[in-house]
Amino acid sequence: MAEGNVFACHSTEGWRSKLQEAIDTKRLVAVDFTATWCGPCRVIGPVFVELSKKFPEIFFLKVDVDELRDVAQEWDVEAMPTFIFIKDGKAVDKVVGAKKDDLERKVAALAAAATTTEATLPAQA
């Protein structure tokens, strides 16, 4: 299920499938670890959706920590919201808390870095 360009993962299998898809396509992943009872999560959620529209080259995923506890534990999520940025299956950065400016800056910087890196890679023969 998607809201904007954000895909909500409702199963561990779905999570792993989406993460693998991002790895296979060499895309940066932005994950919103959230909870339905978390007030700040509800405030920052629409910002995450807007960022997904602004940066379609990034894979945006949403994980409810109560629904997918194993995934939250695997990524050491201790507070909500936590935004983790993943490249090639490894965490490269994160933002903890509903910090709109920090989140927007981080996504923009990582998107620019990903674009620059891809542009400077030699072409595959």
Curated annotation (Swiss-Prot):
Record bears the keyword Repressor: no
Cystine pairs: 38-41
Start and end residues of each Thioredoxin domain: 2-112
InterPro entries: Thioredoxin-like_sf, Thioredoxin_domain, Thioredoxin_H-type-like
CDD domains for the chain: TRX_family
Keyword entries, A-Z: Cytoplasm, Disulfide bond, Electron transport, Redox-active center, Transport
Subcellular compartments: Cytoplasm
Short name of any one Pfam family annotated for the protein: Thioredoxin
Sites marked Deprotonates C-terminal active site Cys: 32
Annotated family: Belongs to the thioredoxin family. Plant H-type subfamily.
Name the record gives this protein: Thioredoxin H-type
Native organism: Picea mariana
Gene: SB09
